[in-house]
Amino acid sequence: MKSLALNGLGRIGRLAVRILAERRPDLLCALNDPAPLDQVVHLLRHDSVHGCPGLPIDGLQEAGQDFLRLGDRKVPLFHAPDPAEIPFPACASLVVEASGRFTRRADAARHLKGAVSHVVISAPSPDADLTVIAPVNGAELDLARHRVISNASCTAHATAPMLRILDQAFGLDHVGMSTVHVVTNDQRLLDLPHKDLRRARAAFMSIIPTTSSAFGALHQVMPTLPEGFGGVALRVPTLNVNLVDVVATLRRDADVAGIRRAFQDAAGGAWKDLVGLAEPHAVSSDFTGRAESVVMDLDLTMTLGPRFVKVFGWHDNETGYAARLCDLVTDLVGRI
């Protein structure tokens, strides 16, 4: 049976392992991370945001080889720093590249050896064969042509449904967005040098304006977006759950009730399980563990004119994104 391997056990990699171990434990045949076995096991067992996993996890060594025991399954763990050097077994037909280091096609393609025919990068890529945010553009995927695939970013997965639903219901004339985004490990805990001088500042002391890779990914996936679409990311001193704020001028008149109805219809129909609806008076911590790509806070919907609107959507930037990553790779393994 064709299976998948995963390189990189950071925030997204570890959550993907949890999800796959619960959904499809038969799919995961190998892992790679430079960290020692005891550290990998500790971080899989204990998570400051998401708590302990729902299955037993342990580490063991046999004949000099490290293994992770995930429930009833034993999965080999390698520690190679270079994708070309990872001895993934012949069962691995697809590699999830989740290290965050190999986002360019040429680097990720170093996995394409032996039985491995496809790679999915768990981050935006400037030159992957295809960037996928299903169902916005998943139908375009051609396994013969697209061998190195990007799963875009958490912000892109949250924003794409908001844009598509507005566009289908009312048409988009102009659109921009901002994301209130949690701290990531590409910031400094204390003031230290960084090429982005704002990110050089202590992450838990300030609101830090910066750029977002989501804009490039969204333009790749939705090439008909209005010219000039862009925005800003505001990094805030929290650990989980982002808020996307989309502002748009529409091609047709809309009121608050009509906008809310469009998102309610989408959440119960074509976007079921990908778009959720928030309970009243929610705050960010209420959305930890939500697996949807975005959870619309319709109480915050505003109209600033008959065609000038603001809509807001929350997303667990870790759980939601890891869930979409697992959706994609599970589908691909079944088709390769």
Model-derived segments and spans:
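Alpha-helical scaffold segments in soluble metabolic enzymes
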Residues: 15, 19, 110, 161-165, ...
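Small-molecule pocket liners
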Residues: 130, 205, 244
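Acidic, glycine-rich segments within the central catalytic cores of soluble metabolic enzymes
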Residues: 168-239
